[in-house]
Amino acid sequence: MAYKIKKVNRGVERRDYRKVSGNLELPNLIEIQTKTFEWFKTKGIDEVLNEFFAMSSNDASASLFLEGWEIKEAKISPSKAKEQSKIYDAPIYVDLQLMFTKTEDISKEFEEIVEKDVKKVLSNWIAEKTDSKNVSLVKNTDNIYFFDVKLKGTEKNDLFQITILEEKEDIIVAEVSVRKWGQVFFGDFPLMTDAGTFVINGSQKVIVSQLVRSPGSYFKTEINNKTGESLYNGDIIPSRGTWLEFETDTKKTAETTNSLFVKIDKSRKTTATSFLKILGLDRDTILNIYDKDKVIVETLKNDNDTGDTYADWAQHVQEIYKKIRQGETATSDGASKYINGLLFDRRKYDLTKAGRFKLQQKLAVKNRLMGRILAEDIVDASGKILVAKNTEISKANIKEVSDALSQDGVMVSSIEYREDIPGSRQIQKVKVYQDNNSKDETFTIVGITPNSKEEHITVVDIVATVSYLLGLEYNIGEYDDIDNLANRRVRTVGELLQNQFRMGLTRIDKNVKEKLSTSDLYKVKVSTIINAKPLTAVIGEFFNLSQLSQFMDQINPLAELTNKRRLTALGPGGLSRDRASLEVRDVHPSHYGRICPIETPEGPNIGLINNLSTYAIVDELGFIRTPYLKVIDGVIQNEHEYLSADEEKEYIISQSNVTKDENGKILDETVVSHYKGDDYIAKVSEVQFIDVSPKQIVSVATSAIPFLENDDANRALMGANMQRQAVPTIVPESPFVGTGIEFEAARDSGVCIVATENGIVKYVDAKQITVESKAGIKTYTLANFERSNNGSSIVQKPIVKVGDSIEAGQIIADGPSVDNGELALGQNVVVAFTTYNGYNFEDAIVMSERVIMEDKFTSVHIDEYVLEVRNTKQGAEEITSEIPNISDNAKKYLDNEGIVAIGTEVKTGDILVGKVTPKGQTQLSPEDKLLHAIFGEKSRSVKDNSLKVPNGGEGIVQSVKRFKAKSAANPDGIDLPADVLEVIKVYIVQKRKIQEGDKMSGRHGNKGIISKVLPVEDMPHLEDGTPVDILLNPQGIPSRMNIGQILEIHLGMAAKKLGVKIATPVFEGVNSNDLDEIMAEAGMENYGKVKLIDGQTGEAIDKPISVGVMYMLKLSHMVDDKLHARSVGPYSLITQQPLGGKAQNGGQRFGEMEVWALEAYGAAHTLREILTIKSDDLKGRTKTYEAIVRSKNIPTPGTPESFNVLSKEIMGLGFDIYLLDNKGNKSQINAYDDDNDLINDESMKHASIDKLTFEDSISLVEIEDLDSFEEVDESEINLSFEEE
């Protein structure tokens, strides 16, 4: 039988049925978080600081230089930060040097100096200027003096260098150069934990990576609807800054030839040649560069030049400036400076390394030569011919031509443009024939030189982009597919944080300029020049408010892992849900091995939120790469290479399920491959690479579904998503039928404790594990009953013993939903596919009581309740058990201080912490004064503000944590907000057994609700007496096509009988032959169908039934969280109708359509009751309550409050509205007499609205009797006031 025994962790073994996967280990699955944050800490911050320093004053006389920077140690540990609701962060300090030079007239008139000694004069002048008494001369030459000056509160002395320019009778004219040093606090920066998360205000957060369009140049074509000819567009898009959009268009004046236009930042279009002219290229240069291309010649005609180069330049600059600034005018020099700033200033225009890489790839000459015939020799700088004229460039010789063109100086010429514009001045030009057949017309391909490095746009880039656009007409160059992953890149945590850091420094830069220009620089300390508040504000806003900063999905380890590996196309600078087209959401060939085609949310975000595939990594430029094994002459090599979507296009890559011998030689003659994004049947000799594993195309969650290959993709999507909602059970159990990825998923999720080095276990208990290694003794602390973001309980259990030898990377303690180092999201249960008296109609699940009694799906949930003790204007609040108007019985669980005892079982409404708040000062009554005199205690005027158990919060008090504010009296306290004296957190734990109404699912998208829990004796059982745990409806399978679950139950039953665990990796695991063999080994017959006996009748069910073991999950949609009833609760302030929703303890909304239903049945009394006393008849509902309590008849309902709201609304329009009774007298709405009943006046018996009258005697509607009621147009009067 074709399997290997795979040791997973601590002696756990699985039969591994994989057939083709190589030996390539999975990369660290959370590398996308940890690696990029490490880059940000070491290089990212450095890049930004070097970009902004030196900072100068407005007149550039004073400058701040960067000397160095460091991130100090974190103030508290991540666990302490969680406990105290703090941020896990560390301070950043930057060392700066301030330099400035001024020319000063130094007076010699110092009273105490009799002989005018220059040294003393200068020394006294410095002392006066700096308010410092510590001025000492270091050294001096002929007329240069160096002084050391110690300012109060600075570590390093200031250095004054005074050069005497001229000495007169009473003054010295000198140049004063000053250097000051100082360390500036740049704020606290959140740090990443080892698990790839941030602790922000006590909660774990994850920064989701963003998938955005890569900077670079993009080309497309469209058909002009009027003329039917092709128009070409080319854009240069930066990461930050101005967009340039080139397009060809037919001007009305010209007959046929297109002209070329450009739009700068979506402004009105202008001719591309006038744009090139303002950059300093003259008419002849432009014609020379493009070899008098017909489109360029036509475009130049539209420029209306006079022939005077400077005048034409000034005119074009001002015209373009007007278009960008929408009609504003400026001098030609001012306009030119503005336009140059937009494009060539590194601070305003950022192409990034990725953008330069894409431009280099797109605009290089060598990348446009494929399939063309050269119209000239390619020669090097000395004139030696490298490639001869008339050579056709094909796949065979493209590498040779590329190598030739990559050499320095090959086919390179220089262009001249404005001196004040930075960047390369060299272009590469190669002539090819426009048409390979006729060879009469040539086209000059103009490109950038192979060694451009600038991270801003250059004139050469613009020139080459225009050339690319012109070549498209002759099929030279390619159009871009913006959905290809070659054109999309990932902004990871590091880059997102670097961008925020840059934004903060931009704000600081403005403040520093102002401060350097206005401060007295002699007295200023370097540490006071920079205020880091703008930076910390930007960072704080990002972590707290950004769309990309999310609460970590902490239901189970898989949810955590997926959250860290998620890619979103939404967020700032990304797409928006409403405008995203189907093409963007769709699966693209370039996703192969990079983005999972299956795991994505259902609903409006489908296709916009994706997940990295299992082997995918993100490179330093942000492009996603996937590994392939090399194939040479049909033999698979043992070395792999990570390829980007761009590089992959050039190779023929085979799928991994080829037949091969033990040496890796492929035995098939032809293999299914992909080439240039399409399927391709290749000869073995053509294949260059092969997939490393069949699971490389799917994500971690998807690859955890066994028999994925037998499931419909829609159901697999649900299966992958629902695994993330599985609640950890008390005793986790790993699946009998796994896929082999369970260990890696658990190890990298961050919930387990993983050994960092080899060693021997010296001590183990429930709180810590001590390991002795070569580096010394290391203690690992275990989490015990900690609350996760989702309210589940985090408990880590040691799985090693004292004396065990462990290796680095081994799991030594399981987390939630982990069993012996393997992911264990659910439980293995015996499942039968049969109906049961209609109880499993519509996917409902029938369950045996045995499952509940054995606590298989019991989970633990922890809720946190927080109480703050504040200092109010009336005085400090107090924690006490002496709460006014509360019985002793209600306080029996409180200790002397008023805090509930740990271990107490509490119900809704019970007091957890007694707290009283002082009311305003009140005058004591004579009785109070008497009591006070007798008992000597103040009868306190306080209000009960205790913390009580909310609706549905009952459980057992697990722990209580108290945090007192730091003060002189309490130096060990923690920093709390102003006015908060103490924070008390009470944790209540609930043990939830599975019950009717809970949602369950398998791993194949087969979900349902438990409809019935049956006693064990009523459940069907096998002939040997084995009771079935769960009954599923067989009708749920055919239409959904998730056949994987059938294979899983048969394999699961076989595994249970054999007492083994099995790994069947996706696309390469157990096939039908293997399954037959395993079932035969386990002694199973009849394709796994068995005779099932009805527990109630004891008779066998007619037909054999499929029974097996399935891995089932309990999902986090539990009936306890959803079921809700209201007896007494809050009302809306305006309409006085009950609020809605469980959180508000609200009522059921009886809306417009429900009213129609009762009207249809003519249930008038019920309807009146619902719309009045059960809703918003204020007095009526009070009277009704009294009547019920006193066993009286329920009074007649009054007028609902919504009618009052309506009448007030009408009054607001300027009308006076009131009720008239039968006799024409005004009457009050909702008038009650003293007998607790409605007024018994005959005329008001029904409190009906007989006439609505307005002061201006316009009668809106008259209701004389019920017959006339039908004539009223319903659209004119609508007295129902509803609140969503």
Swiss-Prot record:
Subunit structure: The RNAP catalytic core consists of 2 alpha, 1 beta, 1 beta' and 1 omega subunit. When a sigma factor is associated with the core the holoenzyme is formed, which can initiate transcription.
Superkingdom of the organism of origin: Bacteria
Enzyme Commission number(s) of this protein: 2.7.7.6
PROSITE patterns xref list: RNA_POL_BETA (PS01166)
Protein name stated in the entry: DNA-directed RNA polymerase subunit beta
Similarity comment: Belongs to the RNA polymerase beta chain family.
Keyword Cytoplasm attached: no
Alphabetically ordered keywords of this record: DNA-directed RNA polymerase, Nucleotidyltransferase, Transcription, Transferase
Organism: Mesoplasma florum (strain ATCC 33453 / NBRC 100688 / NCTC 11704 / L1)
Biological role stated in the UniProt entry: DNA-dependent RNA polymerase catalyzes the transcription of DNA into RNA using the four ribonucleoside triphosphates as substrates.
Keyword Protease attached: no
Stored NCBIfam families: PRK00405.1, rpoB
Biological processes per GO annotation: DNA-templated transcription
Coiled coil region boundaries: none
Reactions mediated catalytically: RNA(n) + a ribonucleoside 5'-triphosphate = RNA(n+1) + diphosphate
Pfam families, per database record: RNA_pol_Rpb2_1, RNA_pol_Rpb2_2, RNA_pol_Rpb2_3, RNA_pol_Rpb2_45, RNA_pol_Rpb2_6, RNA_pol_Rpb2_7
GO molecular function: DNA binding; DNA-directed RNA polymerase activity; ribonucleoside binding
A GO cellular component annotation in the UniProt record: DNA-directed RNA polymerase complex
Top-tier EC class: transferase
